[in-house]
């Protein structure tokens, strides 16, 4: 498909996109001065590292960021607008608004690809008008050469919608700056074999391939660290990475492990973590920060795991935080993780509900549709808190999190669940509800927030927190009774398991993220029918039935909306959660008995529309058994490391046939833009921390980023320009 033969509106953020402010003043006001200082330095660490996301998104993203910082550090939005509208080839008012919308969306996603869906977005105004705005700026008047250089270095890529640039991915299916542009999936698979042999995990790595004049290939596996060489760089703790930093010959190919990826940015993270340590509340927080500092200094994943262990033990802190290379959704191979850092404040009243859910977990787990042999030997009671986000530095903000993602810690030592309360409440604001009857839309609007609260709780605690991985240990022993445990799908003894060097994410690779989200979503809708669960969240009788109905209706509707995140040209899903919800929709449609119906209709505007209906009387007798049978298969294939069976099952329900492709066209025509979040900013002067808030608008988003990152950033610019030769698309 040529660049001019497709609907460009799918790659534009409309001016009416909702922008919400994440309110946290009340929670922040409840902190002591010491806690505010602790939160402030964690906030700084989280956001300084968030610039790494630019380098992990696209070749041009850091340059666009630097351009915007230069423009808006020099003058206000109002001043720039006044000058731009007076120029000889002035943009219209609407075009200037489109410019601001693009800037806000770029900041909100920390890059020019959507954090939810991984598709590119471009400015909704001509390039010439965008240039007029840039060249009307005070920054241009002060230093034209610098502004022109930045603009010329990123403007073509900013606007390009060549097929492979439209989404993140491998080879011709997209771009990924986790890899040099000459890498494809086979390179990632080859290096994964090397990593397994050396017992190294790839969370904090990038892979760049170099080919010399004689055609000899050298793979450069870059570790994120402030350390730049193999020299031991840690005085206090053993530098377990230094000995790995060298060249290897692997299957006739040179593999070179180097340190120092993102070094200058991680130095700022480390400096602020060290400052935060002075305001920690207990020894677990001190030890946690020490290990994080060691991890970001040396590139050690093991140190980050140790920090995560202390984080788990830090029960019920008032100020909650997590930081590092955490989620691997955006790596097309599903192994390398995006940077994220957050700091938040506990909402005590809401957290009490989640604590009650944790207390009930041991009675709820046996109700899941698999034998007890597929469950962890001991339920490790996790923290489950509702948090108000103070700062979340990454490409997107989730509604709930279950971390850490390290299998051996989750299985043997525990984890934490968090629900981000001010994110959930922001989502509950009025918005247009598509594809439902008027009656359903009214009930949905009323109960979406409380029903989603139940779903998030179950999804995180008993979804991600349930199930066992069957492992054969190096000494030949098993962590399950391999002589008696039976595969529920074959009736035979267990034939497969995880071995040393294998994890869930490496074994299931690119399938792992969506598959696991689907498993957790299934647990949520399966268990939400439980009366005790509903009672914990304050829903009983008919009101509880309505919560169940809206939760299931939301899942079914989300499955239809998921089609927006499917790319038919390469048969790829671009968003793990939305693929998962589409899979669940397909399972429920297959259950039959008119439980779920998708009906093509003419909308009130006369254009094609779809009506989603769910028979609430059949949820328990048709829907729940169907989800239970499917969920059992998901768990068994996960437990037994049976990638082939898991892939066959998941691919079957992920398939989008001609019927659903037609529906996809309607979904795209009626899609509503995803909301953006403006976050507060903290400053400290003479030991006193202040909170600054911003308006919920594009201008407010811009002001918040200028407050966080005033002026130029030579560290980021050098990292960007050093990377560019490896990203030739």
Swiss-Prot record:
EC number from the UniProt entry: 3.4.14.4
In this chain, Zn(2+) is annotated as bound at: 459, 464, 517
Q: Which keywords belong to this entry? A: Aminopeptidase, Cytoplasm, Hydrolase, Metal-binding, Metalloprotease, Protease, Zinc
For this chain's record, the cofactor binding note is: Binds 1 zinc ion per subunit.
Major subcellular site: cytoplasm
Enzyme group, top EC level? hydrolase
Give the active-site positions.
460
Q: Would you tell me the Gene Ontology cellular component terms? A: cytoplasm
| Record InterPro entries | Dipeptidyl-peptase3 (IPR005317), Peptidase_M49 (IPR039461)
Location comes to:
Cytoplasm
Gene3D superfamilies noted in UniProt: 3.30.540.30
Instruction: Spell out the reaction equation it catalyses.
Output: Release of an N-terminal dipeptide from a peptide comprising four or more residues, with broad specificity. Also acts on dipeptidyl 2-naphthylamides
What's a GO biological-process term for it? Answer: proteolysis
Pfam name, any one:
Peptidase_M49
GO MF terms here are:
aminopeptidase activity; dipeptidyl-peptidase activity; metal ion binding; metalloexopeptidase activity
| Cofactor(s) essential for the protein | Zn(2+)
Q: Which family does it belong to?
A: Belongs to the peptidase M49 family.
Kindly provide the name given to this protein in its UniProt entry.
Dipeptidyl peptidase 3
Native species: Nematostella vectensis
| Protein's gene | dpp3
